[in-house]
Regions:
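Position-driven detector of the extreme protein N-terminus
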Residues: 2-3, 15
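Short, positively charged and aromatic/hydrophobic N-terminal segments
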Residues: 9-10
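Secretory targeting and sorting signals
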Residues: 14-37
Length: 316
């Protein structure tokens, strides 16, 4: 396929739509066909909402297999962290803007049953990395595990010993792949939508080790997803807490955090198909609109990759 070159406008305008329509577009397989068509024809957003591709395709360093989560390193622009999903070692990989491997840091005391996402956010000791071992394709009832450790440096031999926290969904189990942490320390999960509605859940804080906490439902984001490409696979919050990005295999939605958490105001959304990702799994966003997308890939022929976008986020 032909990718847009650096600096080319990726989407002339992000489409601003009514909240119900925004949810249909995030989970496009839901709802009547007429609704989906109406969303597709929604007028372009007013104002400076636009994203452009800066780097359309970056191959990640060879040790990275089946990348499943991503976070931007706040100390070094252009550096990001990722990890593999189930079957991979409990390791964080630090990579440069062009995918070059900067470090391989085991998470001490952790195991990788099915790591799905990661986030960087505040903790009692300063700034920590949160790794979510929450994969649950069968949506059975089970403990979800969150590991927390101070953010390492790329050259560290291992993280400090990770704290382990456990929680469960009340009632039936759910599959979730998106996690984000806000500046005040609130931790949120987004369910995938394959076995039930796409939902936003809060992990109770302060985190409590040695017990199993109960997750708190915040709101439904969309009905159950009917198409593979609309499953929610990643989430990320900007360091200033103003923006939350959610992604599916084929779409990106950027919310004002306050809107996502309860007001129901519109999201800004865009189609990711032009990037040609192979199983897009992760998203991370900076306060200035720098946005990272990571795809898992498949085997040696389509390894894990990343793309960099720059989005002009409204200041008001």
């Amino acid at each position: 396929m032909t990718h847009a070159g650096p600096g080319q406008l990726y989407a002339r305008r992000m489409r601003r739509i009514a909240s119900a329509a925004a949810l249909v577009l995030l989970a496009g397989g839901c709802g009547p066909r007429a609704d989906a068509e109406e969303v597709a024809e929604a007028p372009a957003a007013e104002g400076p909402w636009a994203c452009r591709i800066v780097t359309p395709e970056v191959t990640l360093g060879s040790p990275v297999r089946e990348a499943s989560g991503a976070s931007l390193d706040r100390r070094a622009p252009g550096v990001f962290w990722t990890h593999g999903d189930s079957g991979n070692p409990p390791v964080l990989f630090a990579l440069g803007r062009n995918g070059e491997l900067l470090g391989r840091v085991p998470v001490e005391g952790a195991r990788n049953r099915d790591w799905e996402d990661m986030a960087i956010g505040p903790c009692p000791g300063g700034t920590c990395v949160y790794v979510a071992d929450i994969g649950n394709n069968n949506a059975r009832q089970m403990d979800l595990v969150l590991y927390r450790a101070p953010v390492p440096s790329p050259g560290d031999p291992a993280t400090a010993p990770a704290e382990e926290f456990r929680a469960r969904f009340p009632g039936a189990g759910r599959d979730a792949e998106g996690v984000f942490v806000l500046p005040q320390g609130e931790i949120y999960l987004v369910t995938k939508g394959g076995s039930g509605p796409v939902e936003l859940w809060r992990w109770p804080t302060p985190l409590a080790a040695g017990t199993v906490q109960q997750l708190e439902r915040v709101r439904e984001l969309a009905p159950r997803v009917r198409q593979l490409g609309d499953l929610v696979t990643g989430a990320g919050a900007s360091p200033d807490g103003r923006w939350v990005a959610l992604r599916t295999y084929g779409r990106l939605a950027i919310y004002r955090a306050a809107d996502l958490l309860g007001t129901g105001e519109p999201a800004y959304t865009m189609d990711l198909a032009p990037l040609g990702e192979s199983f897009g799994e992760a998203v991370a966003i900076e306060s200035d609109g720098t946005l990272l997308l990571v795809s898992e890939g498949r085997g040696v022929t389509t390894g894990s990759r990343a793309a960099w976008l720059q989005c002009a986020l409204p200041q008001a």
